Amino acid sequence: MDSNTITSFQVDCYLWHIRKLLSMRDMCDAPFDDRLRRDQKALKGRGSTLGLDLRVATMEGKKIVEDILKSETDENLKIAIASSPAPRYITDMSIEEISREWYMLMPRQKITGGLMVKMDQAIMDKRITLKANFSVLFDQLETLVSLRAFTDHGAIVAEISPIPSMPGHSTEDVKNAIGILIGGLEWNDNSIRASENIQRFAWGIRDENGGPPLPPKQKRYMARRVESEV
Protein backbone atom coordinates (compact mmCIF):
# COMPACT_ATOMS: atom_id res chain seq x y z
CA MET A 1 0.00 0.00 0.00
CA ASP A 2 1.33 3.44 -0.97
CA SER A 3 2.60 5.40 2.06
CA ASN A 4 1.17 8.66 0.71
CA THR A 5 -2.29 7.08 0.59
CA ILE A 6 -2.02 6.11 4.26
CA THR A 7 -0.67 9.52 5.29
CA SER A 8 -3.44 11.32 3.41
CA PHE A 9 -6.06 9.17 5.11
CA GLN A 10 -4.57 9.75 8.57
CA VAL A 11 -4.50 13.53 8.11
CA ASP A 12 -8.07 13.53 6.75
CA CYS A 13 -9.21 11.60 9.84
CA TYR A 14 -7.63 14.10 12.22
CA LEU A 15 -8.94 17.13 10.35
CA TRP A 16 -12.42 15.59 10.41
CA HIS A 17 -12.04 15.20 14.19
CA ILE A 18 -11.23 18.92 14.53
CA ARG A 19 -14.25 19.85 12.41
CA LYS A 20 -16.43 17.57 14.55
CA LEU A 21 -15.30 19.41 17.69
CA LEU A 22 -16.37 22.70 16.10
CA SER A 23 -19.77 21.24 15.28
CA MET A 24 -20.24 19.94 18.82
CA ARG A 25 -19.56 23.45 20.14
CA ASP A 26 -22.13 25.01 17.77
CA MET A 27 -19.42 26.99 15.99
CA CYS A 28 -20.40 26.13 12.41
CA ASP A 29 -23.25 26.60 9.93
CA ALA A 30 -25.57 24.16 8.13
CA PRO A 31 -23.35 23.63 5.03
CA PHE A 32 -20.44 22.82 7.35
CA ASP A 33 -22.51 20.15 9.15
CA ASP A 34 -23.69 18.83 5.79
CA ARG A 35 -20.12 18.32 4.59
CA LEU A 36 -19.18 16.82 7.96
CA ARG A 37 -21.80 14.06 7.63
CA ARG A 38 -20.82 13.34 4.05
CA ASP A 39 -17.10 13.18 4.85
CA GLN A 40 -17.74 10.85 7.81
CA LYS A 41 -19.31 8.31 5.45
CA ALA A 42 -16.42 8.75 3.02
CA LEU A 43 -13.80 8.18 5.75
CA LYS A 44 -15.55 5.02 6.94
CA GLY A 45 -15.56 3.72 3.38
CA ARG A 46 -11.90 4.56 2.83
CA GLY A 47 -10.95 3.01 6.18
CA SER A 48 -12.72 -0.21 5.24
CA THR A 49 -11.03 -0.27 1.83
CA LEU A 50 -7.56 0.40 3.29
CA GLY A 51 -8.08 -1.89 6.29
CA LEU A 52 -7.17 0.90 8.73
CA ASP A 53 -8.71 1.68 12.12
CA LEU A 54 -10.20 5.19 12.23
CA ARG A 55 -9.15 5.88 15.83
CA VAL A 56 -5.53 4.86 15.23
CA ALA A 57 -5.45 6.78 11.95
CA THR A 58 -6.75 9.90 13.72
CA MET A 59 -3.97 9.75 16.32
CA GLU A 60 -1.32 9.31 13.64
CA GLY A 61 -2.83 12.18 11.69
CA LYS A 62 -2.58 14.39 14.76
CA LYS A 63 1.18 13.72 14.99
CA ILE A 64 1.65 14.57 11.31
CA VAL A 65 -0.31 17.82 11.56
CA GLU A 66 1.51 18.88 14.75
CA ASP A 67 4.90 18.29 13.09
CA ILE A 68 3.86 20.44 10.13
CA LEU A 69 2.54 23.25 12.33
CA LYS A 70 5.81 23.39 14.28
CA SER A 71 7.67 24.40 11.11
CA GLU A 72 4.90 26.60 9.69
CA THR A 73 5.33 30.38 9.90
CA ASP A 74 2.57 32.98 9.84
CA GLU A 75 4.02 34.43 6.64
CA ASN A 76 3.82 31.07 4.85
CA LEU A 77 0.23 30.74 6.00
CA LYS A 78 -0.67 34.17 4.62
CA ILE A 79 0.88 33.31 1.26
CA ALA A 80 -0.95 29.98 1.09
CA ILE A 81 -4.31 31.57 1.89
CA ALA A 82 -3.80 34.36 -0.64
CA SER A 83 -2.89 31.95 -3.46
CA SER A 84 -5.62 29.36 -2.85
CA PRO A 85 -9.14 30.13 -4.12
CA ALA A 86 -11.91 29.16 -1.73
CA PRO A 87 -14.77 27.01 -3.03
CA ARG A 88 -18.33 28.22 -2.62
CA TYR A 89 -21.15 26.00 -1.40
CA ILE A 90 -24.37 26.00 -3.45
CA THR A 91 -27.58 24.70 -1.86
CA ASP A 92 -30.73 24.04 -3.87
CA MET A 93 -31.99 21.70 -1.14
CA SER A 94 -32.74 22.30 2.52
CA ILE A 95 -31.33 20.04 5.24
CA GLU A 96 -34.73 18.31 5.39
CA GLU A 97 -34.77 17.66 1.64
CA ILE A 98 -31.22 16.33 1.49
CA SER A 99 -31.61 14.03 4.52
CA ARG A 100 -35.15 12.74 3.92
CA GLU A 101 -35.55 8.98 3.45
CA TRP A 102 -37.20 7.86 0.21
CA TYR A 103 -38.20 4.55 -1.37
CA MET A 104 -38.46 3.08 -4.87
CA LEU A 105 -41.23 0.81 -6.16
CA MET A 106 -39.20 -0.23 -9.23
CA PRO A 107 -35.58 0.53 -8.31
CA ARG A 108 -32.88 1.06 -10.89
CA GLN A 109 -29.26 1.75 -9.96
CA LYS A 110 -26.13 2.47 -11.94
CA ILE A 111 -22.57 3.37 -10.95
CA THR A 112 -20.70 5.87 -13.10
CA GLY A 113 -17.51 7.79 -12.33
CA GLY A 114 -17.62 7.30 -8.57
CA LEU A 115 -21.30 8.29 -8.43
CA MET A 116 -24.39 6.20 -7.70
CA VAL A 117 -27.46 6.96 -9.81
CA LYS A 118 -30.77 5.74 -8.36
CA MET A 119 -34.21 6.17 -9.88
CA ASP A 120 -37.72 4.80 -9.46
CA GLN A 121 -38.83 3.47 -12.84
CA ALA A 122 -42.42 3.29 -11.63
CA ILE A 123 -42.68 7.08 -11.99
CA MET A 124 -44.53 8.10 -15.17
CA ASP A 125 -46.00 11.28 -16.68
CA LYS A 126 -44.75 13.56 -13.90
CA ARG A 127 -43.17 16.99 -13.89
CA ILE A 128 -39.84 16.61 -12.14
CA THR A 129 -37.34 19.17 -10.87
CA LEU A 130 -33.66 18.42 -10.25
CA LYS A 131 -32.05 20.07 -7.23
CA ALA A 132 -28.47 19.71 -5.99
CA ASN A 133 -26.08 20.72 -3.23
CA PHE A 134 -22.46 21.07 -4.37
CA SER A 135 -19.29 23.11 -4.10
CA VAL A 136 -18.11 25.48 -6.83
CA LEU A 137 -14.54 26.45 -7.70
CA PHE A 138 -13.58 28.81 -10.55
CA ASP A 139 -17.30 29.20 -11.33
CA GLN A 140 -17.67 25.48 -12.10
CA LEU A 141 -19.10 22.55 -10.16
CA GLU A 142 -16.27 20.99 -8.15
CA THR A 143 -17.78 18.36 -5.82
CA LEU A 144 -21.34 17.03 -5.79
CA VAL A 145 -22.80 16.42 -2.34
CA SER A 146 -26.20 15.21 -3.48
CA LEU A 147 -28.61 15.64 -6.39
CA ARG A 148 -32.26 14.66 -6.06
CA ALA A 149 -35.27 14.67 -8.36
CA PHE A 150 -38.56 15.97 -6.92
CA THR A 151 -42.11 15.80 -8.27
CA ASP A 152 -44.39 18.84 -8.05
CA HIS A 153 -45.74 17.39 -4.79
CA GLY A 154 -42.25 17.14 -3.26
CA ALA A 155 -41.80 13.36 -3.57
CA ILE A 156 -38.23 12.18 -4.23
CA VAL A 157 -38.03 9.88 -7.26
CA ALA A 158 -34.31 9.80 -8.14
CA GLU A 159 -30.92 10.62 -6.68
CA ILE A 160 -27.25 10.97 -7.55
CA SER A 161 -24.73 10.69 -4.71
CA PRO A 162 -20.98 10.08 -4.33
CA ILE A 163 -19.89 6.56 -3.39
CA PRO A 164 -17.92 6.94 -0.11
CA SER A 165 -15.49 4.10 -0.76
CA MET A 166 -14.48 5.39 -4.21
CA PRO A 167 -12.16 8.29 -5.12
CA GLY A 168 -13.52 11.70 -6.07
CA HIS A 169 -15.44 12.61 -9.20
CA SER A 170 -15.01 15.21 -11.93
CA THR A 171 -17.47 17.68 -13.42
CA GLU A 172 -17.75 15.41 -16.45
CA ASP A 173 -18.66 12.50 -14.18
CA VAL A 174 -21.50 14.59 -12.75
CA LYS A 175 -22.68 15.60 -16.23
CA ASN A 176 -22.75 11.98 -17.36
CA ALA A 177 -24.63 10.90 -14.23
CA ILE A 178 -27.24 13.63 -14.72
CA GLY A 179 -27.57 12.61 -18.35
CA ILE A 180 -28.25 9.01 -17.34
CA LEU A 181 -30.81 10.14 -14.75
CA ILE A 182 -32.60 12.46 -17.19
CA GLY A 183 -32.65 9.82 -19.91
CA GLY A 184 -34.08 7.24 -17.53
CA LEU A 185 -36.83 9.53 -16.27
CA GLU A 186 -37.75 10.83 -19.72
CA TRP A 187 -38.03 7.23 -20.94
CA ASN A 188 -41.25 7.03 -18.89
CA ASP A 189 -42.63 10.29 -20.37
CA ASN A 190 -41.68 12.46 -17.40
CA SER A 191 -40.79 16.10 -18.09
CA ILE A 192 -37.56 17.23 -16.44
CA ARG A 193 -36.32 20.65 -15.46
CA ALA A 194 -33.04 21.39 -13.71
CA SER A 195 -32.40 24.14 -11.21
CA GLU A 196 -30.67 27.25 -12.46
CA ASN A 197 -27.63 26.42 -10.31
CA ILE A 198 -27.20 22.99 -11.94
CA GLN A 199 -27.45 24.51 -15.41
CA ARG A 200 -25.10 27.36 -14.64
CA PHE A 201 -22.33 25.55 -12.80
CA ALA A 202 -22.44 22.12 -14.47
CA TRP A 203 -22.99 23.27 -18.05
CA GLY A 204 -22.26 26.97 -17.87
CA ILE A 205 -25.64 27.88 -19.37
CA ARG A 206 -28.79 29.63 -18.22
CA ASP A 207 -32.18 28.33 -19.35
CA GLU A 208 -34.98 30.57 -18.15
CA ASN A 209 -37.51 27.85 -19.00
CA GLY A 210 -35.74 25.41 -16.69
CA GLY A 211 -35.32 22.78 -19.39
CA PRO A 212 -32.91 19.85 -19.10
CA PRO A 213 -29.31 21.17 -19.23
CA LEU A 214 -28.29 18.83 -22.03
CA PRO A 215 -27.93 19.59 -25.74
CA PRO A 216 -30.32 17.44 -27.86
CA LYS A 217 -27.49 15.29 -29.26
CA GLN A 218 -26.17 14.39 -25.80
CA LYS A 219 -29.70 13.80 -24.48
CA ARG A 220 -30.37 11.30 -27.28
CA TYR A 221 -27.06 9.56 -26.57
CA MET A 222 -27.82 9.24 -22.86
CA ALA A 223 -31.37 8.07 -23.57
CA ARG A 224 -30.04 5.31 -25.84
CA ARG A 225 -27.67 4.19 -23.06
CA VAL A 226 -30.54 3.90 -20.61
CA GLU A 227 -32.78 2.22 -23.19
CA SER A 228 -30.15 -0.46 -23.85
CA GLU A 229 -29.80 -1.12 -20.11
CA VAL A 230 -33.55 -1.31 -19.48
Swiss-Prot record:
The record's SUPFAM superfamilies line, in alphabetical order, gives:
Ns1 effector domain-like, S15/NS1 RNA-binding domain
Keyword RNA-binding found: yes
An individual GO BP term: symbiont-mediated suppression of host mRNA processing
Name the InterPro entries on file. NS1, NS1A, NS1A_effect_dom-like_sf, uS15_NS1_RNA-bd_sf
Compartments (UniProt record): Host nucleus; Host cytoplasm
Stretches for region Disordered: 209-230
Give the GO molecular function terms.
protein serine/threonine kinase inhibitor activity; RNA binding
Q: Where is this region: CPSF4-binding?
A: 180-215
Per the database entry, which stretches of residues form a coiled coil? none
- Consult the record and explain the modifications the protein receives after translation: Upon interferon induction, ISGylated via host HERC5; this results in the impairment of NS1 interaction with RNA targets due to its inability to form homodimers and to interact with host EIF2AK2/PKR.
- Write out the entry's keywords from A to Z: Eukaryotic host gene expression shutoff by virus, Host cytoplasm, Host gene expression shutoff by virus, Host mRNA suppression by virus, Host nucleus, Host-virus interaction, Inhibition of host innate immune response by virus, Inhibition of host interferon signaling pathway by virus, Inhibition of host PKR by virus, Inhibition of host pre-mRNA processing by virus, Inhibition of host RIG-I by virus, Inhibition of host RLR pathway by virus, Interferon antiviral system evasion, RNA-binding, Ubl conjugation, Viral immunoevasion
Region PABPN1-binding, residue ranges: 223-230
Residues spanned by motif Nuclear localization signal: 34-38
Name the segments for region: RNA-binding and homodimerization: 1-73
Q: What is its main location?
A: host cell
Question: Position of motif Nuclear export signal?
Answer: 137-146
Q: Which GO terms describe its cellular component?
A: host cell cytoplasm; host cell nucleus
Q: Does the keyword Nucleotide-binding apply?
A: no
Assembly, per entry: Homodimer. Interacts with host TRIM25 (via coiled coil); this interaction specifically inhibits TRIM25 multimerization and TRIM25-mediated RIGI CARD ubiquitination. Interacts with human EIF2AK2/PKR, CPSF4, IVNS1ABP and PABPN1.
Q: What family does the entry list? A: Belongs to the influenza A viruses NS1 family.
Job description of the protein:
Inhibits post-transcriptional processing of cellular pre-mRNA, by binding and inhibiting two cellular proteins that are required for the 3'-end processing of cellular pre-mRNAs: the 30 kDa cleavage and polyadenylation specificity factor/CPSF4 and the poly(A)-binding protein 2/PABPN1. In turn, unprocessed 3' end pre-mRNAs accumulate in the host nucleus and are no longer exported to the cytoplasm. Cellular protein synthesis is thereby shut off very early after virus infection.
Q: What is known of its domains?
A: The dsRNA-binding region is required for suppression of RNA silencing.
What is the recorded name of this protein?
Non-structural protein 1
Q: What is the primary gene name for this protein?
A: NS
